[in-house]
């Protein structure tokens, strides 16, 4: 049926072309009626049939929303039509013989086939948009534990702070909760920390009373303030990158006024995503002497707490969800299976794809900056955190002008993409970060699949992003799926133009994990792909409705369907099929 329609369409267009170009030149033809531009006239100028062409007509792009390869064919054929029109119109009347008619017939047949391809592309793109709209509404984030107390939580005195979770080069993190129940207030009073009292010094060792301690669903990150001054506006200006993943409610306290007064072109506000940390509250307060401070970070304390301290008396506090551990800690005690490790890598790619879509580059991806929360079945859910080194400037996007060596290129030098680490400053030099975080995910994949990170360590085994060659990359274990092995090598290509984007890489793993039967077909067409997507949509909606708690794989399928783009999906499918054909 499709071939019959294509032939019919081709004959119709060929007949129109013959009538158009073999007629007598002049203002009229045929029975003396004014010339009406038929379909061929529009094709000769690259227009759709029936589209007005004239000085007052608005131009319309061909193949809008269709894959690039179809638009290329359409534009190429339109150019060929224009050349043929010039060639045959310039001939005397009757100059078009049987050969010319055959050329036009073949030309019209080609147009009919391309029209059929375009119709398939339009149907596929429309179906992807409809599926995306459904799952964008269904794909809900984790609930905000402070949502019921919208105007609370903007003072340090309102929190009960527990033991230290960890510290980095610029902050310390503590577990915390907001006591509201009577039993929690009794526990808070037993260690001398009732809401509203706000003691500056918390006795060390009291947090070890585990039997009395309540659950700590929150984590408070206390930034170390060495050079930002003590005013809220100065702290906000210096540490604004930490607020990129903050919700709007997080800035409703004292920072609301400061954020309102800030000039345009500052750091972006990142939209929420399940694989990206969310800051629930952000506020400034006096620096307290928290448990272990004198041993872990005495030099950054203010002089009133430590005579040799260099810190200011006021700093920034960020309230977030308390996760079980970091990715480094999780991998130290667990060895995920190859399939689970592939799903973990996929989660990082989903988070990075969201950052790129929002115009944000993390620039400090490492296993210490990825948090892990196991689901009910013990499967890890990964969340990207610590945006202190991110690039989130509305003025430059992901293209950072690199005019001098004083421009900050990011945080982690070991996992810095080659296009970043080898960049040289100049008047027009620009660093493109659009695929830099995807490269870092490729390096982290070695750790997730159970091997040492090749860009860490010492000696000859360590690779440097500035100078490594792709042939030097160690091979992943044979137990790792071949598609995942090939993807890791592709993500670590030195040439960023040959590297897949995070969105295409994520789609590729989605197809590899869930679309085995569909991609096994030798003749993969858009209609078959859409049929598979509709089946996945129905199954995912049913699983999401029946399960009390979403498992990791169900949540990943919902993310995949909520980010459907036909162009990126087609690229991933073609790339995956080519890899499988080469095996």
Region spans (language model):
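Activation segment/activation loop of eukaryotic-type protein kinase catalytic domains
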Residues: 368-414, 426
């Amino acid at each position: 049926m499709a071939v019959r329609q294509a032939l019919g369409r081709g004959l119709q267009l060929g007949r129109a072309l013959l009538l158009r170009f073999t007629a007598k030149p002049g203002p009229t033809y045929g029975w003396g009626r004014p010339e009406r531009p038929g379909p061929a006239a529009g094709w000769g100028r690259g227009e759709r049939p029936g589209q007005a062409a004239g000085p007052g007509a608005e131009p319309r792009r061909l193949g809008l929303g269709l894959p690039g390869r179809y638009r290329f064919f359409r534009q190429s054929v339109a150019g060929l039509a224009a050349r043929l029109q010039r060639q045959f119109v310039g001939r005397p009347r009757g100059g078009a013989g049987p050969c010319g008619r055959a050329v036009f017939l073949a030309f019209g047949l080609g147009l009919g086939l391309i029209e059929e391809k375009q119709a398939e592309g339009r149907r596929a793109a429309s179906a992807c948009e409809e599926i995306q709209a459904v799952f964008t509404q269904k794909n809900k984030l984790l609930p905000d534990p402070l949502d019921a107390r919208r105007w609370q939580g903007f003072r340090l005195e309102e929190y009960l702070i527990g033991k230290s979770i960890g510290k980095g080069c610029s902050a310390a993190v503590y577990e915390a909760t907001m006591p509201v129940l009577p039993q929690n207030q009794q526990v808070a009073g037993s260690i001398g920390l009732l809401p509203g009292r706000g003691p500056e010094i918390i006795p060390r060792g009291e947090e070890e009373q585990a039997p009395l301690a309540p659950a700590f669903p929150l984590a408070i990150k206390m930034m170390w303030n060495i050079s930002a001054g003590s005013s809220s506006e100065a702290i906000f200006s210096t540490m604004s990158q930490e607020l990129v993943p903050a919700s709007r409610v997080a800035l409703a306290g004292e920072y609301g006024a400061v954020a309102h007064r800030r000039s345009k072109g500052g750091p972006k506000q990142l939209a929420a995503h399940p694989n990206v940390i969310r800051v629930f509250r952000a506020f400034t307060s006096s620096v307290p002497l928290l448990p272990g401070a004198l041993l872990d970070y005495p030099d950054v304390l203010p002089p009133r707490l430590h005579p040799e301290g260099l810190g200011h008396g006021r700093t920034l506090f960020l309230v977030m969800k308390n996760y079980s551990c970091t990715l480094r800690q999780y991998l130290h005690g667990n060895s995920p299976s190859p399939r689970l490790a592939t799903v973990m890598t996929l989660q990082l790619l989903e988070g990075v794809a969201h950052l790129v879509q929002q115009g944000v580059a993390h620039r400090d991806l490492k296993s210490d900056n990825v948090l892990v929360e196991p689901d009910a079945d013990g499967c890890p859910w990964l969340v990207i955190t610590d945006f202190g080194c991110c690039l989130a400037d509305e003025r430059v996007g992901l293209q950072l002008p690199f005019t001098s060596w004083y421009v900050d290129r990011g945080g982690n030098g070991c996992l810095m993409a080659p296009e970043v680490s080898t960049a040289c400053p100049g008047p027009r030099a620009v660093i493109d970060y659009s695929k830099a975080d995807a490269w870092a995910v490729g390096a982290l994949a070695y750790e997730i699949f159970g091997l040492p990170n090749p860009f860490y360590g010492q000696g000859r085994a360590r690779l440097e992003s500035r100078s490594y060659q792709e042939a030097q990359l160690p091979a992943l274990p044979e137990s790792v799926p071949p598609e995942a092995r090939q993807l890791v090598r592709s993500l670590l290509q030195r040439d960023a133009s040959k590297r897949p984007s995070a969105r295409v890489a994520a789609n590729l793993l989605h197809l590899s994990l869930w679309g085995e039967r569909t991609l096994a077909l030798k003749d993969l067409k858009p209609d078959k792909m859409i049929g598979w997507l509709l089946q996945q949509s129905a199954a995912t909606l049913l699983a999401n409705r029946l399960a009390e708690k979403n498992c990791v794989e169900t949540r990943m399928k919902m993310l995949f369907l909520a980010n459907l783009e036909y162009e990126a999906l087609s690229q991933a499918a073609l790339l995956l099929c080519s890899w499988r054909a080469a095996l």
